[in-house]
Design a protein with these regions (language model features):
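Basic nucleic-acid-binding interfaces
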Residues: 1-152
Length: 152
């Protein structure tokens, strides 16, 4: 399959992938921590640093006073839980180390983030497109239509 046939796909030596996750997590006790633009931007830069270190691509990110939204993509060799652990764990460690006053006043237990999170996948093709592309691929591989029985 030619590269131009799969829009926004990532090509590596071993695989091609194109999937995205929408991830949301909240601060511990829903504390409103990122109340200034400076704190919000600092968390964005920390999350970008962590993502870069862990082969995670952040497509979109919003840091709200008490929660974070990210649209991420990462190789299929990485488990979604590993990506979440990296983003939440490392960002909390770096942020609280930089802000001991916030750690002492709001997060006495040393946890910036609530342990829970929401994650969903974002599809980039409809069922019709998937069926059409699968049929197209089958035809390309067999060299002619009708080489294998259809399961329609």
């Amino acid at each position: 399959m030619a590269k131009e046939e799969i829009r926004d796909a990532v090509y590596t030596r071993r695989y091609i992938y194109n999937f995205h996750y929408h991830l949301i997590w909240v601060t511990k006790y829903r504390n409103k921590t990122f109340v200034t633009e400076q704190l919000s931007n600092e968390m964005k830069s920390i999350l970008q640093l962590v993502a870069d270190d862990n082969d995670i691509v952040i497509k979109k990110m919003e840091v709200m006073p008490d929660h974070v939204h990210v649209l991420i993509s990462f190789p299929p060799s990485k488990a979604p839980t590993s990506a979440i652990k990296a983003l939440k764990g490392r960002s909390a460690f770096i942020f609280l180390r930089r802000h001991p006053e916030i750690r002492q006043s709001q997060y006495w237990g040393c946890h910036l983030w609530s342990p829970s999170y929401y994650m969903s996948t974002l599809g980039n093709m409809s069922n019709t497109s998937t069926i059409k592309n699968t049929t197209k691929l089958k035809n390309a591989l067999t060299g002619a239509k009708g080489a294998y029985p259809s399961h329609d």
